[in-house]
């Protein structure tokens, strides 16, 4: 009973912080967990997170000497992998969390990646700038996913690719109770032990369960104008990677 009460309290606390607008609360949250973000990702995903990032970069494709943007870049893993995979590309990593960007700059110093503070709701780039735009764990953390997708569509060149990695609510099948238990209790507990921030990871769990299904997210891509939209699920259906073409 005590564990259930604590979990419910954390969910209510997180909803109070984010109900009006996710922006300020999410920015503050990511600033707070920046130092332990990478370790927590590895533990929480059982080491599968790098595999997913490689899949994202492969789906983005080789931009040649063109420009690519990794939004919600966090501590820079996808941007750095893009740079290593396609060394001729001009890579920009953007995030609205300054602390996350500071971690990215320290981790990948001297690699020629352009790190920029930017808001996905209003990108500081001209129309038709990028050959590809990637992002991980962005759309679940914004107020209006359709608006952000429209903004990504705007800055992509015609024929450019958008690739999105995010959590998705698992299907309600025979293993659903076990997945739900891990999200509701396991992840917040890991957050408390590793990142010293149980509330932030209770938010992750709650927002995942309330986020769009992979099918609905694919429809949002199409609604923003993207064509040839596909997706692939990972980790018992709790991770989805979507991609589409402008």
From Swiss-Prot:
One biological process term from GO is:
menaquinone biosynthetic process
The pathway that the record names for this protein is: Quinol/quinone metabolism; menaquinone biosynthesis; menaquinol from 1,4-dihydroxy-2-naphthoate: step 2/2; Cofactor biosynthesis; ubiquinone biosynthesis
Its recorded reaction(s) are: a 2-demethylmenaquinol + S-adenosyl-L-methionine = a menaquinol + S-adenosyl-L-homocysteine + H(+); a 2-methoxy-6-(all-trans-polyprenyl)benzene-1,4-diol + S-adenosyl-L-methionine = a 5-methoxy-2-methyl-3-(all-trans-polyprenyl)benzene-1,4-diol + S-adenosyl-L-homocysteine + H(+)
Query: Its Enzyme Commission number?
Result: 2.1.1.163, 2.1.1.201
- Any Pfam family from its record, for instance, is Ubie_methyltran
**Domain of life where this protein originates:** Bacteria
Could you list this entry's UniProt keywords, alphabetically sorted.
Answer: Menaquinone biosynthesis, Methyltransferase, S-adenosyl-L-methionine, Transferase, Ubiquinone biosynthesis
Judged by the first EC level, this protein's enzyme class is transferase
List positions binding S-adenosyl-L-methionine: 75, 95, 119-120
Transferase as a keyword of this entry, yes or no, is yes
GO MF terms listed in the record are: 2-methoxy-6-polyprenyl-1,4-benzoquinol methyltransferase activity; demethylmenaquinone methyltransferase activity
Question: InterPro entries given for it?
Answer: SAM-dependent_MTases_sf (IPR029063), UbiE/COQ5_MeTrFase (IPR004033)
User: Which family does this protein fall into?
Assistant: Belongs to the class I-like SAM-binding methyltransferase superfamily. MenG/UbiE family.
Q: What does this protein do?
A: Methyltransferase required for the conversion of demethylmenaquinol (DMKH2) to menaquinol (MKH2) and the conversion of 2-polyprenyl-6-methoxy-1,4-benzoquinol (DDMQH2) to 2-polyprenyl-3-methyl-6-methoxy-1,4-benzoquinol (DMQH2).
Record's HAMAP family? MenG_UbiE_methyltr
PANTHER family in alphabetical order: 2-METHOXY-6-POLYPRENYL-1,4-BENZOQUINOL METHYLASE, MITOCHONDRIAL, METHYLTRANSFERASE
Q: What is the protein's name according to its record?
A: Ubiquinone/menaquinone biosynthesis C-methyltransferase UbiE
């Amino acid at each position: 009973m005590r564990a259930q009460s604590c979990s419910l309290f954390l969910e209510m606390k997180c909803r109070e912080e984010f109900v009006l607008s996710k922006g300020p609360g999410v920015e503050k949250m990511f600033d707070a967990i920046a130092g332990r973000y990478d370790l927590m990702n590895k533990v929480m995903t059982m080491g599968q997170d790098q595999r997913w990032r490689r899949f994202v970069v492969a789906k983005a494709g080789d931009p040649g000497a063109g420009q690519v943007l990794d939004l919600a870049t966090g501590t820079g893993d996808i941007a750095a992998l893009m740079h290593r995979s396609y060394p001729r590309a001009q890579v920009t990593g953007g995030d609205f969390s300054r602390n996350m960007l500071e971690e990215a700059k320290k981790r990948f110093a001297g690699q020629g990646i352009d790190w920029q503070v930017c808001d996905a709701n209003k990108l500081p780039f001209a129309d038709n700038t990028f050959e590809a735009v990637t992002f991980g764990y962005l759309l679940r953390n914004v107020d209006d996913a359709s608006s952000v997708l429209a903004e990504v569509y705007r800055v992509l060149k015609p024929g450019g690719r958008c690739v999105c990695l995010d959590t998705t609510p698992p299907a309600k099948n025979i293993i659903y109770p076990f997945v739900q238990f891990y999200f509701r209790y396991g992840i917040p507990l890991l957050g408390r032990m590793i990142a010293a921030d149980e509330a932030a990871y209770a938010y992750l769990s709650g927002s995942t369960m309330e986020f769009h299904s992979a099918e609905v997210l694919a429809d949002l891509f199409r609604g923003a104008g993207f064509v040839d939209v596909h997706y692939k699920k990972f980790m018992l259906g709790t991770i989805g990677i979507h991609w589409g073409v402008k």
